[in-house]
Amino acid sequence: MNLTPGSLYFMRERDHVTGDISAYVKIGLTRDDRTSESRKGDHQTGNPREIIVIEELVSPAISELETQMHARHAIDRITGEWFALSETQLSDAYLLAQKLAKNLEKHLPGLQRVEQIAATLSTEEEIKPDSTLLDIHEVYKTNAAELMAVEDELKGIKETLRDFAKNTGGINGIASWRVSAPRPKIDEKRLQADHPKIHSSFTSSETSMASRFTATKPRRAKTTKEKPETDEPANPPLDRLDFFLDRDQTVEQLHARHLILLARQSELTWEKDFIEAQMKVACGNAKSIAGICSWPRLEAIKSKFDKRGFTAAHPDISDSYTFTPAPTYSFIVNEFHPYALKIGGTK
């Protein structure tokens, strides 16, 4: 978790001519001791409406707090950092932000301790858990089971929407295909095989920490979804990426459910992060806690190829081993709704 502190702000816009205040609220952050008033100036530039800072608060781990607020209000999110909030909803959102900030303050010493432990190599010791750790683990397993159920439902909704949008670029306001733009890269394996001495002269070793935390949790339930008779293509039809289907009530309801689930997923992930921090602190320098978690932190030596130096020294060879990977395609369900939902209010 990024513990960098900052300020969370809530902004509205006011029309200079009519004095009307927008129904939309921007929830954003500032870092590096910048005030919300100074950030307000960034948004004011070129904006014909007056920016008003309604509320703000200071918190550690400000990026985590902002992410939580955006996800928990996904059902109210219109686009980007803008949310459709009534005065009552805005008040509730600010109270939630205060609650989450206090939660971060409470757990900050433990989170800072985790950062310290993460920077040290683990021993071969395995700790025997006491009753407190066993209780924490039970809470973790309950959280993990619900989180997996939410993730599985989100995956199912995504697959249903993708099936609905087959042979098109997506569904207006709800989902679309995202096409990557791969950068050219050097085929190092082929270069090493063909020119081992040249490759070796631009390769160095660097030492880093290899770390992975895993905790024992329930197995994910097996899905019983039947496989279709004909598999859908993994990639979208490239000649129809600009063609979008119109929404209907069914897909809007699915999208609304998706947004509500995002809020719950975020809440559960928030809880999981703090539970895992407790486990890591309890683990300390040891590599594991018997039956609960494993957190080995080992020294790893990796090879690093100096691509820039190689290209400058051998431009012709570099060109012959440079290629551009094929683009990848991802079907993305919007985490906001730029249209009027029949259902409203944060869940």
In which residue ranges do the predicted regions lie?
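Conserved catalytic/binding loops enriched for acidic/polar residues
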Residues: C293-P296, A300
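Protruding loop/beta-arch "assembly-hinge" segments enriched in small, turn-prone residues
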Residues: E206-T216, Y321-K347
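Non-catalytic accessory segments flanking enzymatic or RNA/DNA-binding domains
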Residues: M1-N167, I174, E188-T250, A263, ...
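N-terminal targeting/anchoring "stem" of glycan-biosynthesis enzymes
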Residues: D15-V17, A313-D316, S320
